[in-house]
Amino acid sequence: MARPQQRFRGVRQRHWGSWVSEIRHPLLKTRIWLGTFETAEDAARAYDEAARLMCGPRARTNFPYNPNAIPTSSSKLLSATLTAKLHKCYMASLQMTKQTQTQTQTQTARSQSADSDGVTANESHLNRGVTETTEIKWEDGNANMQQNFRPLEEDHIEQMIEELLHYGSIELCSVLPTQTL
């Protein structure tokens, strides 16, 4: 029977014994690989460092954090590239949260003005446009991530039509018995 081991958030053990760590961001729907480590504790500390970089002080970590502690060599488990990537995720999530807050405020203002006009909030919600565009601007401005659902759907339909046209000949036959008059 295997010896019970303490489980850490964002850490798992490979079948040959090494420990790996990764972190996921729930808002951005991203997963970032943090690396392979010799011990579960090192992997958990790397996760904690990444969580603080990606989510700020509100991050859920494996170990308590003391900002006044003297940094040791084990506290630098993440590379500079990985640290920069995590910081970009943090900035993108801040911007996404800020956009969500402004959208909520404008929706609240619209529903209040609609209520004062005698229209219910549900009716004003239904009358608004169906497509919404979410845009995340990275700090350095290199990448813009846009989600626009209507054009994507039209592209998908167009692709399906092209596949049907180029698929080859299709023979259609009737499954109903023919009636004689």
UniProtKB/Swiss-Prot annotation:
Top-level taxon: Eukaryota
SMART domains: AP2 (SM00380)
A Pfam family this chain is assigned to: AP2
Record keyword DNA-binding present: yes
Keyword flag Glycoprotein: no
Residues of the DNA-binding region: 7-64
Ranges for region Disordered: 101-133
GO biological process, alphabetically ordered: ethylene-activated signaling pathway
Family assignment from sequence similarity: Belongs to the AP2/ERF transcription factor family. ERF subfamily.
Name of the protein this chain belongs to: Ethylene-responsive transcription factor ERF003
Gene coding for it: ERF003
